[in-house]
């Protein structure tokens, strides 16, 4: 045990050394994405800004060392036959996607960092990323303990907004106990009473089920990707734990519930009983990346009970 711990610490020290070419970006709280192309060009995405070229070139060997050091720490191999690395960089909790030859002309990787920004909903309004009307709807939903879905595409700031909503819970309901489940450590909770679990994707169902024995007031899930997990979260939210939140990939406020329905198809041999969705979800908040501006809440939809004459979900959209 001691030997393995010593090996891990040595490998971590090696990784720290190898990360020096991008360490400034790793430690910059506004940086969300670090991209190194096969030619070594270092591109940076900062929250609220367009992706920009840093003007720097990272040498091929430095790129390869970052990939290999990360792989060694997370017990994965990268070779000419296993040319892809997917994982999380230890200590920094940044998601890494990397390729080496022969799939690419030269080693390349992309890092997605967990947000370090501590923004409030007031900050979003001040920066023009959230209208006062939308803020009022979100705040009322938090107060009324409605379940909230936060949707958008990749890199639209869903988790950053989720963190701001958690801060709103802490402000309005500081005694509420939060139970947080995610498969990558990205949620930055500032509530006084919470338990946060980081689990493998195949352990998410167990983690959500265990929530019921942990006396939570609200259950918060990082991102819904799988039907069984979504079903467990919906069931938990409908059995005495309202006021939860989670993120989901969708291209509009009115596309979130259909997306959730599509995930649930994994769990049902026949049609999904849609009432378990519209009875559980109260508000859908949709973010979009605005060119040269960054993420902005562009649509909020209140879910209405029942279905329309065509069997579709009903909303009041703002």
Question: Language-model segments: which ranges?
Answer:
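Conserved P-loop NTPase
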Residues: 278-318
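P-loop NTP-binding catalytic core
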Residues: 41, 45, 51-144
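Conserved glycine(s) of the Walker
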Residues: 157
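Residue-level signature of catalytic and energy-coupling elements of molecular machines
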Residues: 34, 98, 241, 281
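Hydrophobic anchor at the beta1->P-loop junction of P-loop NTPases
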Residues: 150-152
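Switch/coupling sub-region of P-loop NTPases
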Residues: 145-148, 160, 164-280, 286-290
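N-terminal anchoring/assembly modules that precede and organize ATP-driven motor systems
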Residues: 1-53
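Conserved AAA+ ATPase "sensor/coupling" helix adjacent to the nucleotide-binding pocket
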Residues: 115, 260-264, 303-304
